[in-house]
Amino acid sequence: MFLIGTALSLLFNSCSKDPVIPENETDNKLHEDPSKMTIRLVECHLHADWNEIQKVGGPHQNPESPAKHMKRIQEITYELKAGKGWRLAEGSQSKFYVQKNGDYYTYGKYTPAPVYLMFIYYYNAKGDLMNSQFIENGQDNIHQHFFTPENVKPTFDGQPEADDNEPQKLVDYLYVDTTPWDKTKHSKEAEITGDSNPIGLKGVIRFLKDRKEFDLKIRLYHGYKSKGNPETGTFDPFYKPSGILIQRGTWDINLNIPVVVFWSREETVG
């Protein structure tokens, strides 16, 4: 009996040291899956150099315009429908109408205008805001939004160009996420941390070509262990997640948002 007991003890001790099979991250996320997503664009001008925004802030909202397609605040909302996937919410506008920025300098500072603050809000099935779930409990270390223009074509009065399919020639984007995530630097209650920890719940975007239509592919990356690129030791650019990053994670969100860049700011300044 002693030998049998010893054998069983060794058997169970051996089993307890077997390699632990990692959980499937797609089935065991530490956050809910969103059921609604709202993207808000706020047209702004700058009180700081574009290249300093991630340190000091600077975008200020422009006053409202009576023009139909020149709303200073625009929102697009998608909802997850059973059996249908993501669908445009009832009553939501379907496209963003924006302007190509003009290149301006103020007291030696590069202050292109307009630029657009872009906020993303996620809601769970109960309708509760759930942005914090992508931040808390270390989730900020494995989540990052990517923004990639696709399906580019000229508007009715535009012309195709050779570099239309180069994302960085169409848009420029800066991560301006804050810590805490739901406070602002302007209120002196938060610091901008988007450069050192890009998430993309808050950002500022500008459009570099006029008379273009495209889909802005918005993807929320969920890394299995990290969102950093192990080959470069840095974060991938906003428009291009690397192949190795894609292999080491999944997408929490993958949606196309239609954008129309109907004219240039310089055409409206006389």
PLM regions and their residue ranges:
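Bacterial N-terminal signal peptides
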Residues: 2-10
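Post-signal-peptide N-terminal segment of Sec-exported extracytoplasmic proteins
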Residues: 38-80
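Short beta-strand elements
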Residues: 57-66, 231-270
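Exposed beta-sheet edge/beta-hairpin loop segments within beta-rich domains
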Residues: 102-116, 134, 181-217, 222-232, ...
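Extended, polar beta-sheet/loop recognition surfaces of beta-rich domains
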Residues: 128-186
